[in-house]
Amino acid sequence: MENFTEVNQPITPKKEIGSILSHAFENFTGTFLYALVFVVIYLLAYFIFNGLLSFFIPGGGDYQNEVMRVMNDFVEDKKYDLNAITELQNSLEAARTTAVMISEVISKSITSALLAPLVVGIIYISYQFNAKKEVEFGDLFIGFRQNTAQIIIYGFITTALIQAGLEINMLIGMYLSFAFFIGLPIVFFENTSAIEGIRKSFSLVHANFITVLVLWLLAGIISSAGVLFCLVGVLFTFPFFFTARYSIYSAICGAPYKVKS
């Protein structure tokens, strides 16, 4: 088992928005090929896992079938004006029963939990690059070898809370996503429990509220920018949301280094 501890190193960005953003971009561009592999694996696995789980959870399969029926009717009608789009939106909303909402929360939580170790991998690769250490393809899967159970638990709990929050009110879900933003690096680098990662992330995020909020918003905007390029661009911009986590974490907590247990 590898552990990590905190030290102050020159590679650690200052607790300033510009410094952290520059640090994140440097890591992102330096690990781009690994990030591209990561996002392909992540998105494929996410849609496969989430799709399969939705059919096995009560209410999920019926909703998927209803969505497919509504979308087929929309395409066959060949009416793409504002009224048709509004009608489509209303039909999809009508199909979202309470059972469907619960099934989505469960399926997305399980999917995110299973993929959380992969997210840790891209965070760890950012660390390796930043520390001028050799990066290997196997580093992408380190989350499946170290503190895996707690990483998975963290992924499940936080996603369940975020998804439930989004169902209640979008602002609640967004706030929870923001509050949990650096919890995963904490669980991994500090080899701690999921609950401790949640607690410490809340504490540190609120202690550095404005800085983290601005960076969280910018990371989200940059990661979503690929949608403007026929969706394909998401493959190139999506990983930035995850590499930014390491930069924010290292600015607040100090850059970790590997030690023997």
Description of each model-found segment:
Residues 1-23, 255-261:
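Low-complexity, intrinsically disordered extramembrane tails and loops of integral membrane proteins
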Residues 2-4, 97-131, 159-195, 223, ...:
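Selective recognition of hydrophobic, aromatic-rich stretches within alpha-helical transmembrane segments
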Residues 11, 147, 168-170:
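Short, charged helix-to-loop "capping" segments that act as catalytic/coupling loops
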Residues 14-45, 137-164, 178-227:
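Interfacial aromatic "cap" segments that immediately flank transmembrane helices
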Residues 14-127, 131, 150:
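Short, small/hydrophobic-residue-rich motifs at membrane-helix boundaries and re-entrant hairpins
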Residues 47-54, 62, 66, 148, ...:
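Alpha-helix boundary/capping detector
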Residues 71-86, 186, 190-211, 250-261:
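Alpha-helical transmembrane segments and their immediate juxtamembrane interface regions
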